[in-house]
Amino acid sequence: MTQRRAMLILHGKQALNEDVRDAVADKRKQGWELDVRLTWEAGDARRLVGEALAAGHRHIVAGGGDGTLRDIAEALALAETQASLTILPLGTANDFARAAGVPLEVSKALQLMDVAPRAVDLGEVGGKLFLNMATGGFGSQVTANTSEDLKKVLGGAAYLFTGLTRFSELHAAHGELTGPDFHWRGDLLALGIGNGRQAGGGHELCPTALADDGLLDISILPAPQEVVGTLRSLLEGGLGIDNMFIRTRLPWVELKSAQGLDINLDGEPLSGEDLRFEARPGALQVHLPADSPVLSRAPMLNRPD
């Protein structure tokens, strides 16, 4: 059997994960030469990707959460390599993996190493790359003291509003978004710019996004003139806020906000008053299920090893 080589770059907190240890042993029995390296601090993922490529590896496995996945995907894209990526979701949210249909069971996720890779896009902003989504709002995760009423009415945008306990605490940011044949300006409560579909642990801000269409899905949650009253009316009427989103797909979009807007790139913070988001089509080869919901195009022929 021809031996196949890969490097698993594993988040340091997963070093003692017995499921990972067993699955790695199984892959080795199947003929894989699978090296394992651990991340410890910021910058390790990029360094380890560089070491893997220098050692001749053409296949990287990202073992961790959405942040680890973003770091490794960015490093591979910046290296301008045709090395491919398998996703081993070990985080809390695993948003891109879940939306893409990647199994959460370790052994099943590693079975994708034997599936032909597909070309997927990345998003780029401010010199940073992201695989899943850029979100803007009032925080990156919902907290325990966010009231259940607020969670119910905010729906997919709930996690953007950190620590809010009353409708009266909501406030909007003024922003302007411009792209090809698209212009929107006004007050917004939340924003999602997605290559993937969900963020914050399963909240679908861009529910129909495709990772291989060369486009970014834009979801804007505009702020009604009377925020508190409108949200209360929606809640009392049994409706959520998801149907208020303005959505479009663009190859690029420029975001301007005089007071600045805090952006979260799969866990990586970014802020600015003038940001340009672009899709980088086919920037990464990723091993995904053949029926992955985020894929649209027919699979490419297998590349020779």
Swiss-Prot record:
GO biological process, one term: phospholipid biosynthetic process
Alphabetized SUPFAM superfamilies for the sequence: NAD kinase/diacylglycerol kinase-like
Enzyme superclass (EC): transferase
UniProt GO cellular component terms: cytoplasm; plasma membrane
Binding site for ATP: 39, 65-71, 92
Organism domain of life: Bacteria
Stored InterPro entries: ATP-NAD_kinase_N (IPR017438), Diacylglycerol/lipid_kinase (IPR005218), Diacylglycerol_kinase_cat_dom (IPR001206), Lip_kinase_YegS (IPR022433), Lipid_Phosphate_FormReg (IPR050187), NAD/diacylglycerol_kinase_sf (IPR016064), YegS/DAGK_C (IPR045540)
Annotated ranges, domain DAGKc: 1-129
Coiled-coil residue windows: none
Active site per UniProt: 268
EC number(s) recorded for this UniProt protein: 2.7.1.-
PROSITE patterns registered for this protein in UniProt: DAGK
Cofactor note: Binds 1 Mg(2+) ion per subunit. Ca(2+) may be able to substitute.
Keywords, sorted A to Z: ATP-binding, Cytoplasm, Kinase, Lipid biosynthesis, Lipid metabolism, Magnesium, Metal-binding, Nucleotide-binding, Phospholipid biosynthesis, Phospholipid metabolism, Transferase
Primary location group: cytoplasm
GO MF: ATP binding; lipid kinase activity; magnesium ion binding
Location in or out of the cell: Cytoplasm
One Pfam family in the UniProt entry: YegS_C
Role: Probably phosphorylates lipids; the in vivo substrate is unknown.
Sequence similarity: Belongs to the diacylglycerol/lipid kinase family. YegS lipid kinase subfamily.
HAMAP family: YegS
Protein known as: Probable lipid kinase YegS-like
